[in-house]
Amino acid sequence: MTDTTTTPAAGFYGLGIAPKLLEALDKLGFKVPTPIQQKAIPVAAEGKDMVGIAQTGTGKTIAFAIPMIQQLAAKEGKGLVLVPTRELALQVAEVVKQFAPLLGMQAAVVIGGESLGRQRQELFRRPRIIIATPGR
């Protein structure tokens, strides 16, 4: 008989993700990585360049955000995520802001159509990750 029980985020364990991030994945309900996550996370975690294509809603943001956050936790530097639209920037920021604080990082969003003063204040806090659109 095969044991079908799983440990928290068991499917993510073999991908080299830090324990705090694994715990967060489990708490947020992510139990099994999607195909794009299975393929992308190990490659991105090694710091390699890649291109990933997948349908909307398949977890592409987690596929690049988790390795980026983990890399930044291990060394100095900053992360920049440039996306083409304000809406996508806000979506990416929502995901990044769920995970980055777990490893002591802040993220900021810099987009058009929002208060420049508020965005400037966020940047003065020296976030490690900036999510932005090219227009700003």
Predicted segments with their positions:
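Walker A/P-loop NTP-binding motif
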Residues: 38-50, 60-76, 87-90, 94-99
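Conserved pre-motif I regulatory segment
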Residues: 2-53
